[in-house]
């Protein structure tokens, strides 16, 4: 498992990065530094190159040699939701589907063993694959907490219900709550800090 360097701050790696929104939130709350990202879409990759000059983009995660990927303290991933979403085909997390990229992510976690993992997907994951994700993380030794949050919970004018999953390895120590600086950049962090502070309450878990 990656040893966390408290003096240098957390290093982060990002899988299925997209335009990097999840990473912006995690870095804003935790002060983490993005060491590398992995995004194959050329348009999103152009955004990342402009936003994070000098940060290597590892590209297609299905083509990665995980043994050659630099270890980091924290890995984020917001993998494709098409087969999980209620508006999609409903295949869930199965090999050969877009949402089946979770299987590739899990293989990467098995090799890299970061201290922390932060995941995001549509709230429908609760009934279309959450058990698989939690089981895979548990098999790797992670303690996991999750919560469903709407964009409107942070003041946005739209619903956009999403599930956020935080996995911590027991060897990492006291957890991430101490790393979350309430004064960082004035960012709204009700949801993220709620996950860091402890398990979600029943109201958060059962939102439709």
Locate the predicted segments by residue.
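Class I S-adenosyl-L-methionine
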Residues: 2-8, 64-74, 82-208
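SAM cofactor-binding core of SAM-dependent methyltransferases
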Residues: 12-64
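Structural recognition of the beta-strand scaffold that forms the well-ordered cores
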Residues: 13-15, 76, 124
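Generic enzyme active-site microenvironment
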Residues: 37, 58, 76, 118-119
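Glycine-rich, N-terminal phosphate-binding loop of Rossmann-like dinucleotide-binding domains
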Residues: 79
